[in-house]
């Protein structure tokens, strides 16, 4: 994920899946994407997919959203460490990130949302935490139209994962 101003973050999967030295990959991120500050973080969910959008999202140039789980959850400590990490890092203006938390007690991927212009599309599950998830986005992003969408979402696969790369099957003929 990126803030659009030269700061990016990803899980350490980026290092695991690319057969080049970490420093070379960091240099490519700067050369091709203009990333001057690159946060590569151990995946706190510790699942098979290790995608950052399953637990975090930059909401703006100053705000980041990190999932929150009950203290009885198996990944509680790792997720809290990740939230603290972001709270201790600085945005482009040298200020600490404003960290918003979104409650996901049953691994709901509310962070796997999609932002398009002034709209935020949030995956919903028909559960008791859906309204709270929408409210978190409304509070974090005043002026945005926050909309919930039900679907066959999974904890590691929701709106952002599915929509960010919709192919045009007729494009290459």
Q: Can you say where each PLM-predicted feature lies in the sequence?
A:
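Histidine/cysteine-enriched polar flanking segments
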Residues: 1-173
């Amino acid at each position: 994920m990126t803030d659009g101003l030269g700061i990016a973050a990803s899980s350490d999967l980026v290092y695991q899946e690319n057969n080049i030295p970490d420093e070379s990959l960091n240099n490519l991120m700067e050369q091709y994407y203009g990333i001057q500050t690159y946060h590569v973080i151990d995946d706190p969910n510790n699942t098979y997919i290790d995608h950052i959008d399953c637990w975090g999202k930059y909401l703006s140039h100053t705000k980041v959203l990190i999932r929150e789980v009950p203290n009885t959850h198996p990944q509680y400590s790792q997720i809290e460490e990740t939230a603290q990490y972001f709270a201790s890092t600085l945005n482009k203006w040298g200020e600490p990130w404003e960290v918003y938390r979104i409650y996901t007690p049953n691994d709901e991927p509310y962070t796997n949302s999609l932002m398009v212009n002034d709209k935020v599309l949030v995956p919903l599950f028909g559960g008791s935490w859906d309204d709270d998830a929408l409210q978190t986005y409304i509070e974090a992003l005043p002026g945005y139209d926050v909309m919930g969408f039900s679907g066959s979402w999974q904890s590691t696969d929701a709106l952002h994962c599915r929509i960010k790369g919709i192919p045009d099957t007729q494009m290459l003929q």
